Design a protein with these regions (language model features):
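C-terminal catalytic histidine-bearing segment of alpha/beta-hydrolase fold enzymes
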Residues: 353-427
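Alpha/beta-hydrolase fold nucleophile elbow
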Residues: 240-253
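Hydrolase active-site cap/lid region
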Residues: 260-307
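Cap/lid segment of the alpha/beta-hydrolase catalytic domain
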Residues: 166-227
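N-terminal targeting or regulatory segments adjacent to alpha/beta-hydrolase or S9 domains
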Residues: 1-128, 412-427
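Glycine-rich nucleophile elbow surrounding the catalytic serine of serine-hydrolase chemistry
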Residues: 251-263
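Proline/glycine-enriched tight loop/beta-turn segments at coil->beta junctions
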Residues: 138-143, 151-163, 186, 331-333
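The feature captures the conserved acid-bearing segment of alpha/beta-hydrolase catalytic domains
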Residues: 287-351
């Protein structure tokens, strides 16, 4: 009885949170070949795109896009590969919120942050900037932005420098996950809080929300995913240049998908925290509550869940579970955390359970943690603290294990951790 009442209460709460924003826009289906054609042309694969006359036939266009996805899966080393940027630089400026909703309390918070900055009452922060290898029609989106949280120099000069790239959820404002980065600093781990494509300072002026990251434009969504993945890998390049030796990624929701794909194609990434995880990109968009407006546009064009799954298979983790355990990705050296929620209406629980089973099947070293809430309620009290604890404690232990490994320590699980270390993570 209690369980049923709790579930009903949680689903109602989750639904209220996913429906309170009224600025979601229903957009029609677009195939978006123009968004991925530059990559195909530069790699001698342009023949995969039908002629412009043929693309007027939706059946021909859909079949071609499915074939391109299959091609990108086979050549994912190229698709998620890149030319290393040459314009890495640190920029100082006052942090801004860049809200994605127009609720009065959010706009008031944004105005207050701007006021304090204009009066010199807030400190400037450092941001890593560079040009993304994946180019789009939006110059502001192609200038990558990652807030830099360097950890204090450790007293032991022989201790390896460790860093993590953090990617928040879809439509996150620019302050989301900043507190996690500060916690990692207290563990001696530096952090780059990466703005996803079309998010915060990278968001085109024509948008209120980060709609172009995930939309009814099939090709643009694929391009945004590729851009996010190569941007993560470029961040690791820069960290490597700064003398860092151990690398991790933490992604929430959409950021989790991006983080997984980056790790599956980069052997340097060994610590992996997937906060809300799913199998197929198309399944989440079709079945998730927060993407109802996207599904509406796709459904009006006659698409089905099964067909959408094929159209976005090249950006779906399910296509790369074997890849993440490959020798190329150094899968045997990776450690992973999967966090999912029992009452998730955005990343339905059934898909998260499939992730857990897939990780077991391929032999990835991982641990799973379950939250007694939903997707959006993860950001509410007390669940945000539970989620933060799971992620922080895992990241702390995983990086500690890498340090011990470097000292020749046994790779078996560590014994009970001293209370002082537990307190460090709790703070």
């Amino acid at each position: 009885m209690f369980r049923e009442r709790y579930a009903r209460w949680m689903y109602e709460w989750e639904t209220r949170l996913t429906t309170r924003d009224e600025n979601r826009v229903v957009r029609p289906l677009e195939w978006g070949f123009d968004w991925i054609e530059p990559f195909l042309q530069s790699h001698g694969l342009s023949s995969a795109v039908p002629s412009s006359d043929a693309l007027h036939d939706d059946a021909v266009a859909e079949a071609a896009m499915v074939r391109i996805n299959q091609l990108l899966i086979r050549r994912s080393d190229l698709f998620f590969g890149y030319e290393r940027p040459t314009d890495f630089r640190l920029e100082e400026r006052h942090p801004e919120l860049f809200p994605t909703n127009v609720r009065p309390e959010t706009l008031a918070k944004d105005a207050e942050i701007k006021r304090l900055a204009s009066e010199g009452k807030t400190e400037k922060a450092k941001f890593l900037r560079f040009t993304s290898p994946e180019r789009t029609p939006y110059a502001e989106n192609d200038l990558v932005n990652a807030r830099w949280y360097p950890a204090a120099e450790h007293k032991d000069p022989k201790r390896p420098k460790q860093a993590i790239v953090v990617m928040p959820q879809w439509n996150a404002d620019a302050f989301s996950h900043n507190s996690l980065c500060a916690i990692f600093n207290r563990m001696g781990i530096s952090a780059l809080r990466l703005s996803k494509p079309y998010h915060d300072v990278r968001r085109p002026a024509e948008l209120e929300r980060s709609d172009y990251a995930v939309s009814a434009n099939i090709g643009r969504t694929i391009s945004a995913c590729r851009q996010a993945v190569v941007d993560i890998r470029c961040c690791v390049d820069w960290l490597e240049d700064q003398g860092y030796e151990h690398f991790g990624v933490l992604g929430t929701s959409l950021g989790s998908c991006y983080a997984f794909l980056a790790s599956a194609h980069d052997r340097r990434i060994r610590v992996n925290a997937f906060n809300h995880a799913s199998t197929s990109f198309g399944d989440v968009v079709w079945a998730g509550q927060s993407t109802r407006h996207i599904r509406q546009g796709l459904e009006e064009a006659g698409l089905t869940q099964e067909r959408l799954r094929a159209l976005w298979s090249a950006i779906s983790p399910i296509s790369f579970y074997d890849r993440i355990m490959s020798a190329e990705a150094a899968g045997g050296d990776k450690r992973a955390l999967v966090v999912y929620a029992d009452y998730d209406l955005t990343f339905p629980r059934e898909y998260s359970l499939q992730v857990v089973e897939a990780f077991k099947r391929v032999g990835l070293s991982f641990e799973a943690r379950v939250l007694p809430c939903g997707h959006y309620t993860t950001g509410e009290t007390p669940f945000q603290y539970m989620d933060g604890w799971h992620m922080g404690w895992f990241v702390y232990r995983a990086f500690k294990a890498l340090r011990q490994e470097g000292c020749g320590a046994r790779s078996a699980p560590a014994k009970a951790v001293p209370e002082v270390e537990e307190d460090l993570v709790a703070r």
